[in-house]
Amino acid sequence: MKKLLIFALAAMGMVACVKEEVTLLPQGDAISFESAFIDNATRAAVDPSTTTATLNGFNVWGFVKEYDGVIFDGVNVTKNNDVWSYDGTQYWVPNQPYYFAALAPMNSANWGISKATDAAAKLGLGTVDFKNVDGTEDLLYAKEMMTSKGLNEPNGAVKFQFQHLLSKVKFTFKNGFPTETASIKVTNVKMTVPQEAEIDLAQTDYSKAWTSYANTTTLSFGDVEKLAYTQSAEVAYERLTIPAPAEEKQPEDTLETVKFIQLSAEEL
């Protein structure tokens, strides 16, 4: 019995030693996001583009040291009273390189992502496929690279500057009739554009990074008020479209066209 008791005490001592040797990886302050700014904000009254003021959420991806060190994988980041927050707090590991990327609108059914699987992810995130339904939904992307500071040093928040990945289209008409007694009315302005395409986020010129165009959709720009002699006016709505570079030949059924459904002249 005495031998068994001594053995049991020795075993307990070994377990205690093992527990004492377990150490935790040092961590810094919590990773946070703030001041999500959208570049090239527009000023039109009826404008579908997302602005800094109207952006209320985005999905974020984050990697530490290498691409395999995933800390965020499409996590929802939302704004409430100008404060950005997410579930499942992550903390900075001191003196490590970090890579962040974000897409908006958050959780949209019109975009999907195929993430890169190697170091190329550091240049972007992967390939995004986008479907343009009616030209009223924007597509935004941002990335940020930074190195965390030492232990007990504040890192500050990750600040994204979002870029518009789509092009904005509007039409302006001018009454060019040579007589002051003529006015014109333009109604039901439409435009046929590519509906689906993919963009490689590792590229630097996003306007030329679109490929794999498929299908078409018709965007409606509304009407133009009656134009008197030499008067100019814009269509009622602006719309967003997938960029289609002129130097890149597209399939014939996805070429952009403008349709003037009605064009009439009236006397004042």
Feature annotation, model-predicted:
Residues M1-L4, K19:
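Positively charged n-region of N-terminal signal peptides that target proteins for export
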Residues L4, Q96-F100, E266-L268:
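Exposed beta-strand face motif in extracellular beta-rich ectodomains
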Residues I6-L9:
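Sec-dependent N-terminal signal peptides
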Residues G13-A16:
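C-terminal motif of bacterial Sec signal peptides marking the signal peptidase cleavage site
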Residues K19-E196, A209-T211, S220-Q250, K259:
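Short, low-hydrophobicity acidic/polar segments
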Residues I199-A214:
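Solvent-exposed beta-strand/loop surfaces of large extracellular or lumenal domains
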Residues P251, L263-L268:
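Cysteine-clustered segments with highest specificity for TGF-beta superfamily mature ligands
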